[in-house]
Amino acid sequence: DWVTGFEKETGCKVNVKTAATSDEMVSLMAKGGYDLVTASGDASLRLIVGKRVQPINTSLIPNWKNIDPRLKDAPWYVVGQQTYGTPYQWGPNVLMYNTNVFKTAPTSWNVVFDAQNLPDGKPNKGRVQAYDGPIYIADAALYLKATKPELGIQSPYELTETQYKAVLDLLRAQQPLIHRYWHDTTVQMSDFKNEGVVASSAWPYQVNGLVNEKQPIASTIPKEGATGWADTTMLHTDAKHPNCAYKWMDWSLQPKVQGDVASWFGSLPAVPAACKESELLGAEGCKTNG
């Protein structure tokens, strides 16, 4: 609980609205009535371009100094030398797998992209999933970067027309293998427990949740590498409570708060000191979460 302490210390009242997807968050911000949003990287630039969020003054946020240097001035929230929010949490898009099927961790993303028999001798068709979001295009591009070097992919996030076509061809060829395109973490966790799904891209949140339930689940980052995500706390253009909003952004960058959030979600804190200053996260929490 990182809200009650904030309310007691500042006198501000926090009202929370949750959303299942980035598209839903963008829609909610378009309707208005919110002061802040924790926007993922596939929503933050849409909010900036759509003028739904405003630049912030980082000098009004004392804990700004705590932020991981790798996340400062990142292109998903800094545009035209203006800063549109504070880093919240980040993490990798891992390959989650069933340890009863894979006695050793799969070394390649090919287990979800290419038709094949898995180590238990059964086909992967109908037993793998893919993420239902734009980042999965980059996931596929990263796989092709390693497996089809003749395409000349340098960055999975910046593709030529030829490279983009090759990625779409891969995704279309993958479609018959897919059990479900997931976007809801609880549904994906249920699919791994009850629907025979044995491999998929996922977040550490699902992995940790299933492991805590004693499910035969683990995760890995295959040899081709992995993409990632980063959430940013952003201030609505028409925020009615900017003072409390600034206090919340500052509060959210405290090492203990960052560590507690990382422990709850299975993510990585935007503040490195959080790796050592949260009892909930623990000494090995950052390593466990990726």
Question: Which functions belong to the PLM regions below?
Answer:
Residues 29, 141, 191-193, 235:
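Hydrophobic residues within well-ordered alpha-helices
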Residues 38-189:
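Extracytoplasmic ligand-binding site segments that recognize negatively charged/polar headgroups
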Residues 66, 168-174, 213-237, 282-285:
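Periplasmic-binding protein-like
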Residues 35-39, 181, 198-203, 218-219:
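Paired acidic/hydrophobic, glycine-rich loop segments that form the ligand-binding mouth/hinge
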Residues 43-48, 201-216:
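A ligand-binding cleft/hinge motif common to bilobed small-molecule-binding domains
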